[in-house]
Amino acid sequence: MRSVVTCRLWTLPGAPDARAQLPVDFTVDPQPPYLVPHSKEPIRLLYRDEHLLIVDKPTLLLSVPGRHPLNHDCLLHRLDRQYPGVSAVHRLDLDTSGVMVVPRTKAALSELARQFQSRQIDKTYFARVAGCLSPDTGEITLPLTRDWPNRPKQKVCFTSGKSAVTRWRVVAREDKSTVVELFPITGRSHQLRIHLKEIGHPILGCDFYAPE
C-alpha cells in the first residue's frame, strides 16, 4: 500500500511576496515510481516506408518513457536512434507483446491519430485467463479511472470513471484456463486486465491484477 502525505504552507509577512497569506495545499508522494528493469529483447521490424514503421514490441519493454527519469529505455527511444523523428500514436502495456504502428512524419501522426480516434483501426489481443470462461462470446462494460493511492493501477468507478468496453471470444478451453481473443472497443489504461479480473477470470501472469 502506498501512502500520500499532504502538506500546508503559509507565506510569512515580510517575505518577497506577502500578498497571499492563505494556506496552500500540495501533495507529496513519498515513494518513487516503479523502476522498469532494462529489457534485452530486440524489436522486430515488420514493415517500413517513408511514412511509418510497423514493429513487434517484446514483453517487458515500455512503449514510451516512464514517469521516472530512469525509465527511459523504451520502444520509441530505441527506434528513434535509427529512425529519427518517430512518434507514438498508441501504446502497449509493459507486459504485452504485439504489433505497433509508429508514424515517422507529422502527417502520418495526424492521420493515424484520426483513425484511432474514429475507431477505424481494429485492435485484437490474445490472452490466457484463469478458469473456464463462459459463454463463448461476451461484452464487458465497466467504467475505469486511476487508482491514485496505488498508481499506476486503475480501478472500476461508476461515479467518475470513463466508459470502457471490451468484447471477448473464446479460442480454447483447457483444464484450468481459457485462451481468449479480446477486442477493446475503447482504449483505457489496463482496460483488458481489469475487465477480465472483474468478471472473475484474470489474465494469467499479470503482476498487477491477477492473484498469486
Give, region by region, the residue ranges found by the protein language model:
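RNA pseudouridine synthases
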Residues: 1-165, 171-175, 196
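Pseudouridine synthase
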Residues: 69, 148, 175-212
